[in-house]
Design a protein with these regions (language model features):
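Structured beta-strand-rich core segments of catalytic domains in phosphoester-bond hydrolases
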Residues: 402-411, 424, 431, 450, ...
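Metal-dependent phosphoester-hydrolase catalytic domains
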Residues: 3-10, 29-45, 57-60, 69-70, ...
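Pair of pore-lining "gating" transmembrane helices in MFS-fold secondary transporters
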Residues: 14-27
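N-terminal post-signal-peptidase region of extra-cytosolic proteins
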Residues: 431-437, 465, 598-606
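Active-site beta-strand/loop signature of hydrolases that rely on acidic residues for catalysis
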Residues: 26-65, 239-244, 417-424, 435-465, ...
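Surface-exposed cleft-lining segments at the edges of enzyme active sites
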Residues: 229-235, 426-428, 508-510, 538-545
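A generic structural micro-feature
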Residues: 414, 513-516, 607-609, 634
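N-terminal signal-anchor transmembrane helix
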Residues: 375-378, 388-441, 445
């Protein structure tokens, strides 16, 4: 029996995984620019058809087939250099760009190049000894996810793409330069080495697409993790990194004992991944256990899949390219259906997307387990991926801890005087570019004590996966409460400079609408010994939805129950003649604009507003002194600010 050894931090082994890790991180960053650009730039500002958006997204998946002719006609070295450099250059240029149109096309080209790189890299590592090919593929993939989340964590969940200046460009340039050095240092086989595998060995690669769906929407999404687990956004980032460490531990275990992942265990893993995916929207601390266990299982599965897929049979990359392209097509399709179900009436509920992704990845695990028994065991246990993951995890953990102690929330010990209502459009401005700093500056300059936010995302993939709740709270030094209305990460929030006594939320009547609505409330102590009730809401949006808005307004009145003092703010999607407004005014709430506003009070669309749909309503014991529409295009709505006082 061959003795097995344990290797400590092996820099040469990490170097063998580093190129795949960096390209993966850059590819995911480009993908998170592409999907929002399709929605917010091409669709919202350029009125592109949905079919056009779907076609462009599908092209990035189909692009993987280009690996076949590139490998054949350019050879191993030139094809890897060309495609790898394309990803790096596209990412760096996108970082420099401030133009949404240029962002769109750079991210499109960069994402397509990333899809081409995947089969090229797998073909390349197959030319190495079989015991190195698998770890280089899986280790690079999982470390890439870890690196990507570490960079986001350092920026409080905001992608570096949306941060201007030289500071975010510096680490990206260093990583790109290191990648070029790694490409130069690679050993390239002469001629046309065996680079493709049998169909039974590459079939499990189909699991990559569904796996990335679960990672991008849930497991690498600190906002989703925080909202579902019921923890602070900072803890959400830590939990994401802990999940990545669990995945790396599972991968190392899988590589050290590949023969243990037999079909029976593969079946159990597949069932667990499928069943756990049904619980990803269920709030509670149990989500943390699901996150860590699922990530560990995913890491073990990837060890088995990569060892199986790294086996070689013949030259070319036909099977590998086709399977990985199909995998990325599955990713695009599942992600599209998850978000399209909020806008299009589909024959199934969007909640099936996660179980479907878990099922496909689980089947990939089961299939790979049938082949894993034939894979030889490595004579060494390589712990270096865990060490690297731990180092990457400590970076945001330490930085966020320093932030927490150096920048505590600033608290006012007085009665609130200014309130703001702002539909922030997920921080996308009228040009289709995400700029949360512009939103923060609007709120900051308003001097508002309490802010009711609508259309705030904690990490929708089509919104750039930014946890705006956590980011704005940290940036402004304000307390925050949030509750999703359609899933855990999209809904309403309240920012406050005052202590929040208690808070809660409830859904509003939905009818047959696709997008769920609700209201969020908080209570604050005032100088008169009472409690100020503050409510923020966002009502149904369609032009033919007046009756549903009336029902939703009735629900708000029932909750309010004539308590005083109280303030109701929000995007009501209704102008003065509508029944919903009548319900609120007849119940005894007073329109702050009618009392103290100058002009017509139009708030939407922000560029050239022609509708008054954003409201602040006060109870009779409060009087609006000044009501102002703030002229800004940081969102597609203009915010509404009211300075008020207690009536004598």
């Amino acid at each position: 029996m061959q003795a097995r050894t344990q290797t400590p931090i092996a820099l040469h082994r990490l170097q063998m995984m580093a190129l795949m890790a960096i390209i993966t991180a850059f590819g995911l960053q480009l993908l998170r620019v592409l999907l929002p650009s399709l929605v917010w730039y091409l669709k919202e500002t350029q009125q592109a058809a949905t079919t056009t958006l779907g076609g462009l997204a599908a092209l990035t998946a189909i692009a993987g087939l280009l690996a076949i002719p590139l490998w054949r006609f350019l050879g191993q070295r030139t094809s890897l250099w060309t495609v790898g450099a394309a990803v790096l250059v596209a990412r760096l240029l996108e970082q420099l760009s401030r133009d949404p149109a240029l962002d769109t096309w750079l991210s499109l080209l960069g994402t397509a190049a990333f899809t081409v790189f995947l089969p090229l890299w797998l073909g390349h590592v197959r030319a190495a000894p079989s015991l190195e090919g698998g770890p280089r593929w899986a280790g690079g993939l999982l470390l890439g996810l870890t690196l990507d989340s570490a960079l986001k964590g350092l920026a409080n969940s905001l992608d570096l793409s949306w941060i201007g200046g030289w500071l975010p460009l510096l680490p990206l340039a260093l990583l790109a330069g290191w990648s070029l050095w790694l490409l130069r240092s690679e050993t390239y086989a002469a001629g046309m080495p065996a680079s493709d595998a049998r169909l039974v060995n590459v079939l499990p690669l189909l699991g990559l697409g569904p796996y990335l769906v679960l990672q991008a929407i849930v497991f690498q999404n600190s906002g989703w993790v925080a909202a579902t687990a019921g923890v602070d956004g900072r803890i959400g980032i830590w939990l994401v990194m802990a999940g990545n460490l669990a995945a790396l531990a599972g991968m190392v275990g899988g590589f050290s004992k590949p023969g243990t992942f037999r079909p029976g265990l593969g079946l159990i893993a597949g069932l667990y991944l499928t069943l756990s995916a049904t619980q990803l929207q269920v709030p509670g601390p149990g989500f943390i256990a699901i996150l860590l266990a699922a990530q560990f299982v995913c890491g073990w599965v990837w060890a088995t899949i990569s060892l199986t897929a790294a086996q070689t049979e013949r030259g070319g990359l036909g099977r590998t390219s086709a399977l990985l392209s199909l995998a990325m097509f599955l990713f695009i399709g599942l992600a599209f259906f998850y978000y399209a179900a909020l806008d299009l009436r589909l024959p199934f509920d969007r909640s099936i997307v996660f179980p479907a992704a878990g099922l496909v990845f689980g089947l990939a695990a089961l299939w790979a387990s049938r082949q894993g028994e034939r894979v030889p065991r490595s004579p060494q246990v390589d712990w270096s991926p865990i060490h690297a993951g731990l180092f990457l995890s400590l970076l945001p953990a330490i930085w966020l801890s320093v932030q927490a102690f150096s920048s505590p929330a600033r608290t006012l010990q007085r009665t609130p005087e200014r309130v703001l209502s702002y539909n922030i459009h997920s921080a996308y401005d009228i040009t289709g570019r995400q700029d949360p700093e512009a939103i923060a500056q609007v709120i900051e300059s308003s001097g508002a004590d309490i802010v009711g936010l609508q259309e705030i995302s904690r990490g929708w993939l089509i919104n750039g996966s930014t946890d705006l709740v956590h980011w704005l709270s940290q940036r402004l030094g304000m307390r925050v409460v949030f509750q999703g209305t359609s899933d855990p990460v999209w809904g309403n929030a309240i920012l406050s400079r005052l202590p929040i006594q208690q808070w809660g939320m409830a859904p509003l009547p939905r009818g047959d609408a696709l997008l769920g609505r609700g209201y969020l409330w908080a209570e604050f102590a005032d100088a008169y010994g009472g409690e100020l009730l503050f409510i923020t809401t966002h009502l149904h949006q369609t032009d033919d939805g007046a009756e549903l808005r009336r029902q939703q307004a009735t629900g708000l009145v029932e909750f309010w129950g004539e308590r005083q003092p109280a303030i109701l703010v929000g995007d009501l999607n209704a102008e003065p003649p509508e029944p919903a407004i009548g319900v609120l005014l007849e119940a005894g709430l007073a329109d702050a604009w009618s009392a103290a506003g100058q002009g017509d009070g139009l708030t939407y669309p922000a560029g050239t507003p022609d509708r008054r749909i954003d409201w602040i309503l006060l109870t009779p014991d409060l009087a609006a002194v000044v009501t102002e529409v703030i002229g800004t295009t940081a969102s597609d709505h203009r915010p509404l600010l009211v300075r008020f006082e207690h009536s004598p």
